[in-house]
Amino acid sequence: VIQDVDRSAGKLVMATNAAFKPYEYYDGGSIIGLDVDMMHAICDKLGMSLEIEDIEFDAIINAVQSGKADVGVAGMTVTEDRLKSIDFTNSYTTSKQVIIVKDENASVQKMSFAEKLKENFITDNRWQYIAKGLLNTIIITVFAIIIGIVLGFLIAIIRTSHDKNGGFTILNFICRLYLTIVRGTPVMVQLLIIYFVIFASVDISKIVVAIIAFGLNSAAYVAEVVRSGIMAVDEGQFEAGRSLGLNYKQTMMSIILPQAVKNILPALCNEFISLLKETSISGYIGLMDLTKGGDIIRSVTYEAFMPLIA
């Protein structure tokens, strides 16, 4: 990288999958490689700064098509199907495919557990990938479950009110449509649509996108959990509240919901655990989560066991 180049022309966003040595890979916490060096040279020529987005290989073309990235560089093979969607530069390297087999006579130096631990986490401070991924995972899960609980309770109250007294007809229809769509589609599809379609032209933090996506997904499941908890409360509790002079809102807030919450707490805890595990797909939009951190370490050390245990 030439340090004294005027980079006032803006930035060039490069989408890649940094697990393909020697073209793009992690070293010392940074993404380097032949492709990266080439893109730095292009940016030096154009007077632009380079921003590298490490995302899943399958999402690179989507990132370019949606405008989230200006170029995709990841050792792609030119195919007829891909040419229908994107433009390729002239090929600047050729490679050949080989098949590898196990050599029974080869001598392999086995590493001790301590050596594997050092190689996977201590060398080049690779533990930081796990630490950063864990922090992002916790942040996404906590804020997403907050959105899920707040929106889920609101949807549950609207649907329950409609079932009991026929109110909120239009809102109930919207809520039912929302629940059908969200619960009937994979969360990965929802995440990709929100990032590459809805926020395609918006410069927004990936963590915020993940929080919104997982929060909206969680709300659909929380809503039905809360609704079942409300419906499980004996109808006599409603009648008792109304006989005491309380209106519907007061009865719901003071008598019904406290009992419903007590009944659904185990289910809400299960939803939190499920949401924590669902965040493992955040790497598809280039977000460093816990799973992505392990993938980066595994791509460098080729050790499958240790990163997964972490």
Predicted regions and their residues:
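Flexible loop residues that form catalytic
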Residues: M76-T77, I193
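N-terminal, intrinsically disordered, polar/charged segments of Gram-positive cell-envelope systems
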Residues: V1-G10, A106-A114, K118-E119
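Extracytoplasmic small-molecule ligand-binding "clamshell" domains
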Residues: D6-G75
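Short secondary-structure boundary/capping segments
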Residues: Q3-V5, F88-S91, A200-S201, I273
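Ligand-binding "clamshell"
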Residues: E80-S95, E104
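A bilobed periplasmic-binding-protein/Venus flytrap-type ligand-binding module shared by bacterial periplasmic
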Residues: Q97-S107, T123
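Transmembrane alpha-helices and adjacent helix-loop boundaries
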Residues: Q109-A310
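Structural motif corresponding to alpha-helix initiation and N-cap regions
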Residues: F57-D58, R82, C175
